[in-house]
């Protein structure tokens, strides 16, 4: 059952799409206060677990730490980080009873989950203007499905988006991209997408293409499609301030950029230099910005990724002036200004919360200060595109995913988990984040495989790809200045061919399970706790996940390991895709097992009485042969497979 409670005058985020009548008073769980802002406090029993929060740090069970919903462009994802790129304010308290809460609040929201006091959870925010939805049910999964039912259906990506993609910040010219595709095809490593980072643009201006680097962009797009490759260009949140740039001039003329309190347009620097931000909370501006995607769709593009949309700010005029004044005092020998103060001011320039207080949105004629609704920017930027795609391409799906998000954005696109690093711990973070994202409606998700920042290693990339085989978004992405990490940069290319090839062998199953989850408000990834709630060991296992109703995955995520320990909550069939293209199969009883997994192998476990469809190796999604599909698993088991054309809107 879902109950809705109204506090103060909430901002309409439109995260919830189902009409739910308001209930009087407070939820009959914990204590609620509106004396100093808003707070919800409840005691946690020893056995209680807390699930949710979507894109958040640490484990699947969120007990023992402080999490802050405050979309932040901070690439240093260490354990102490309290905020990442998204704000997903849905939690489930799971113990002897099951209860879920969605705090529909677009500003900064704190979740102290046994951090200050180990047996107490407190959720708080500055202003007592929000909706609180309380959901009760028979199980954690029941609560998730009820919640998903009120926030609307998850976005459905085109089938080609379930192929493998290669990306790197640093591909600049048409020749760069053609070289990447050529090397993949020459080495027979599967590939369906190549991502275009900011260097394809003219001076980092949205909806432009550098004509020197791409003299015939439309022809290039078509050439790539002949190679069965979809190009995926990036779109950033900031619009360059430049006379003669049509997007800038039109936005100024129509009043579609965010303004300062005095009515002038707010300026901050991002990649293009000084920029304005489209006022995507203004319905007219949102439509205007979304329609601009047709500039690229009309040239054959059918996939995009939105970035820098927290929105990220390098510095503002005020921030720069403050830094310059501090630096001047230091240079002049002011004893009150030590060197570390200058360094601190420099670090504080980017994404400074004071800047978020300096600009406003026009929402139905009312001026709303950005910091009060900060977490909605990425959501509404992607919404602008998603709504435009329905007009531009009413019959055909277009791939869209974003960096920043709020619940509700899942209806318009997926997300990638942002600028991670080439750390073994980030494989595990990737794994643990997936079910939490699914709880909040984000099904098309994945991380930068191999790591975005720092330098990857061959073994790290192979192990991460073996997890990426199962994530809907399977993309290798790296930062400018890091070690090149395309598979053909390493020895024994056949190992990469095999691991990535397993993805294509499993697409008949993985795509089917994704579509079932999207159409039935279900989870693609589930924690073991959701499937085996009465098994104490399963409830406390966080480095294994269930996919659909048939399989469990348990990737290797430590360096130099030849395998790993796995807990089986029931009898399962251990299946290993071997480096030579064959499969190893062994039925294992319930219990703890050590399984060996070589670097060029991909393991999975099929539940007792189940089987899954597996195809032959293919180098692209269109090359997967239907007639090659066979069932792998328990003899006599059946599987209901979802199929469609992979293109038409549903």
Residue positions per predicted region:
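Catalytic and substrate-binding clefts that recognize carbohydrates or anionic sugar/phosphate headgroups
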Residues: 1-158, 168-170, 174, 181-186, ...
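A residue-level signal for conserved active-site and pocket-lining positions in enzyme catalytic cores
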Residues: 90, 147, 184, 224, ...
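Short, hydrophobic/amphipathic alpha-helical packing segments
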Residues: 65-71, 84-87, 178, 286, ...
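Catalytic core of carbohydrate-active enzymes
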Residues: 63, 78, 376, 382-398, ...
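Aromatic- and carboxylate-enriched substrate-binding clefts and catalytic-loop regions
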Residues: 190-496, 531-532
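Short acidic-glycine loop/turn motifs at beta-strand connectors
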Residues: 92-97, 260-262, 569-570, 579
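Extracellular structured ligand-interaction cores
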Residues: 85-89, 96-98, 106, 129, ...
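Glycine-rich, histidine-containing beta strand-loop boundary motifs that form or position
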Residues: 42-44, 94, 102-105, 113, ...
């Amino acid at each position: 059952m879902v109950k809705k409670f109204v506090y103060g005058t909430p901002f309409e985020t439109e995260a919830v799409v189902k009409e739910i009548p308001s209930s009087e008073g407070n939820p009959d769980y914990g204590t609620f206060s509106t004396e100093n802002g808003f707070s919800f406090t409840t005691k946690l029993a020893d056995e209680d677990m807390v699930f949710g929060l979507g894109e958040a740090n640490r484990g699947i069970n969120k007990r023992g730490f402080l999490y802050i919903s405050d979309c932040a462009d901070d690439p240093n994802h260490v354990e102490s980080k309290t905020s990442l790129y998204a704000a997903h304010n849905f939690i489930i308290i799971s113990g002897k009873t099951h209860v879920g809460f969605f705090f529909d609040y677009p500003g900064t929201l704190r979740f102290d989950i046994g951090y200050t006091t180990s047996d107490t959870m407190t959720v708080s925010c500055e202003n007592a203007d929000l909706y609180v939805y309380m959901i009760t049910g028979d199980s954690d999964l029941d609560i998730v499905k009820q919640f998903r039912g009120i926030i609307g259906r998850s976005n459905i990506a085109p089938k080609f988006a379930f192929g493998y993609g290669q990306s790197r910040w640093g591909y600049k010219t048409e020749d760069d991209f053609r070289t990447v595709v050529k090397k993949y095809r020459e080495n027979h490593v599967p590939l369906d997408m190549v991502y275009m980072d900011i260097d394809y643009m003219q001076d980092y201006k949205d909806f432009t293409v550098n004509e020197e680097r791409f003299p015939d962009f439309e022809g290039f797009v078509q050439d790539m499609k002949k190679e069965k490759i979809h190009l995926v260009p990036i779109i950033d949140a900031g619009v360059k301030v430049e006379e003669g740039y049509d997007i800038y001039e039109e936005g100024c003329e129509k009043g579609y950029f965010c303004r300062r309190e005095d009515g002038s347009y707010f300026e901050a620097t991002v990649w293009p230099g000084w920029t304005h931000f489209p006022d995507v909370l203004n319905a007219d501006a949102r439509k205007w910005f979304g329609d601009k995607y047709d500039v690229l769709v009309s040239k054959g593009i059918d996939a995009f990724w939105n970035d820098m949309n927290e929105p990220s700010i390098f510095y503002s005029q005020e921030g720069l002036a403050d830094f310059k004044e501090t630096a001047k005092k230091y240079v002049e020998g002011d004893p009150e200004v030590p060197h570390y103060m200058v360094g601190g001011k420099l670090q504080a320039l980017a994404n400074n919360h004071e800047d978020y207080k300096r600009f406003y949105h026009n929402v139905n004629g009312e001026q709303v200060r950005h910091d009060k609704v900060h977490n909605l920017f990425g959501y509404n930027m992607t919404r602008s595109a998603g709504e435009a795609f329905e007009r531009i391409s009413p019959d055909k799906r277009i791939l869209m995913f974003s960096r920043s998000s709020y619940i509700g954005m899942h209806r318009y696109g997926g997300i990638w988990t942002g600028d991670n690093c080439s750390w073994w711990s980030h494989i595990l973070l990737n794994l643990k984040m997936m079910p939490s994202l699914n709880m909040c409606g984000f099904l098309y998700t994945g991380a930068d495989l191999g790591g975005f920042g720092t330098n990857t290693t061959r073994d790290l990339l192979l192990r991460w790809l073996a997890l990426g085989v199962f994530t809907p978004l399977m993309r290798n992405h790296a930062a400018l200045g890091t070690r090149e990490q395309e598979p053909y940069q390493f020895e024994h290319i056949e190992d990469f061919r095999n691991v990535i090839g397993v993805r294509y062998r499993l697409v008949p199953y993985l795509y089917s399970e994704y579509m079932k989850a999207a159409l039935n408000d279900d989870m693609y990834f589930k924690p073991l706790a959701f499937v085996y709630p009465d098994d104490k060991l399963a409830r406390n296992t966080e480095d294994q996940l269930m996919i659909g109703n048939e399989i469990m995955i348990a990737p290797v995520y430590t360096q130099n390991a030849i395998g790993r320990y796995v807990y089986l909550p029931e009898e399962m069939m251990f299946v290993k895709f071997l480096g030579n293209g064959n499969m190893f199969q062994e039925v294992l009883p319930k219990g703890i097992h050590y399984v060996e997994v070589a670097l060029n192998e991909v393991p999975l476990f099929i539940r007792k009485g189940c089987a899954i469809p597996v195809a032959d190796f293919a180098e692209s999604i269109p090359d997967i042969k239907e007639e090659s599909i066979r069932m792998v698993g328990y003899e006599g088991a059946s599987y209901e497979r979802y199929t469609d054309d992979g293109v038409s809107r549903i």
